């Protein structure tokens, strides 16, 4: 395993541990680095900010589910995935605004939903509306369910 991946995983593990006891908004990059014995320079070499790290965790752990061809089964898998790490995602989904995980998740789920409903409408505008509606609904439902 490359050193870069080891470093990223150590930072991810530290963030997940910290998020068990405090919200993401209260955790600093310094806290994450202190927890795993790394310096801030190492953190910023790999990630722009703590929100980028949250997105990397999601991408890394979720890629297997996201890449399956059977999207209907994926919805159950998505729920199981979020539930298995609910403390982490409960906190991550509370953040709104720039670089938020909510927006990142919507962006990641968008192509899956687009493929799923792409043939229902003749109009691209109608398809886009439904995909956005479903993505927003998934985020809201996950937040409610995890809380």
Map each language-model feature to its residues.
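Hydrophobic alpha-helical connector segments
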Residues: 66-91, 98
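Short, basic, alpha-helical segments at the C-terminal edge of helix-turn-helix-like DNA-binding modules
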Residues: 28-29, 58-69
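Append "Primarily bacterial transcriptional regulators
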Residues: 11, 30-35, 43, 82
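Amphipathic alpha-helical packing segments from all-alpha helical-bundle domains
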Residues: 77-80, 97-140
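Basic, helix-initiating cap at the start of DNA-binding domains
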Residues: 1-22, 31
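DNA major-groove recognition helix of helix-turn-helix
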Residues: 11, 15, 47, 54-58
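HTH DNA-binding helix-turn interface
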Residues: 19-24, 37-54
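Basic, amphipathic alpha-helical hairpins
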Residues: 17-24, 85, 119
């Amino acid at each position: 395993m490359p050193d870069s991946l080891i470093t990223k995983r150590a930072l991810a593990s530290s963030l997940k541990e910290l998020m068990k006891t405090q919200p993401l908004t209260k955790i600093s990059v310094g806290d994450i680095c202190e927890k795993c014995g790394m310096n801030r320079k190492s953190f910023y070499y790999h990630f722009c900010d703590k929100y980028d790290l949250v997105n990397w965790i999601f991408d890394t752990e979720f890629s297997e589910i996201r890449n399956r061809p059977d999207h209907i089964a994926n919805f159950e898998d998505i729920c199981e995935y979020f539930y298995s790490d609910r403390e982490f995602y409960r906190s991550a989904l509370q953040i709104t605004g720039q670089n938020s995980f909510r927006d990142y998740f919507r962006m990641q789920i968008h192509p899956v939903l687009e493929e799923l409903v792409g043939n229902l409408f003749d109009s691209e505008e109608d398809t886009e509306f439904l995909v956005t509606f479903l993505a927003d609904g998934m985020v809201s439902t996950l937040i409610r369910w995890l809380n």
